[in-house]
């Protein structure tokens, strides 16, 4: 469950390290974002000499949440942190690598490029 003011780790090599969620996109009246939802966020911490700077407004996709995700098979999965991958207007990741595992739900939401870059899909 990602809502406004939630801090997230960045799971790619775009140059940002921490994001703060400003708005969850595409959820209508619902306040919370789940895995695979797009968010608008501000960069709170970034590496020096990288294209993404601190206080930039970016669009990202949630790839991991601490809140358990219940699947149709009855299994639930949760991660150790809240993390997102920064994307461009086309929905492709801005970085060239993805760090850490990502959830299988991203494949269902047609983020196949992020899934293919991830080292592990749970």
Swiss-Prot record:
GO terms for biological process: translation. It comes from the Bacteria. GO terms for cellular component: cytosolic large ribosomal subunit. GO terms for molecular function: large ribosomal subunit rRNA binding; structural constituent of ribosome. SUPFAM superfamilies: Ribosomal protein L14. Part of the 50S ribosomal subunit. Forms a cluster with proteins L3 and L19. In the 70S ribosome, L14 and L19 interact and together make contacts with the 16S rRNA in bridges B5 and B8. NCBIfam families: rplN_bact. Belongs to the universal ribosomal protein uL14 family. HAMAP family: Ribosomal_uL14. This is Large ribosomal subunit protein uL14. The lineage of its organism: Bacteria, Bacillati, Cyanobacteriota, Cyanophyceae, Oscillatoriophycideae.
């Amino acid at each position: 469950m990602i809502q406004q003011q939630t801090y997230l780790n960045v799971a790619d090599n775009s140059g940002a390290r921490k994001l703060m969620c400003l708005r969850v996109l595409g959820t209508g009246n619902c306040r919370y974002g789940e895995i695979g939802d797009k968010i608008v966020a501000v960069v709170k911490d970034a590496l020096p000499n990288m294209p993404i700077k601190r206080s930039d407004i970016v669009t990202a996709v949630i790839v991991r949440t601490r809140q358990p995700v219940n699947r149709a098979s009855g299994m639930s999965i949760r991660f150790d942190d809240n993390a997102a991958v920064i994307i461009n207007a086309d929905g492709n990741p801005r970085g060239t690598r993805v760090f850490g595992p990502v959830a299988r739900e991203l494949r269902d939401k047609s983020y196949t490029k992020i899934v293919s870059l991830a080292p592990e899909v749970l």
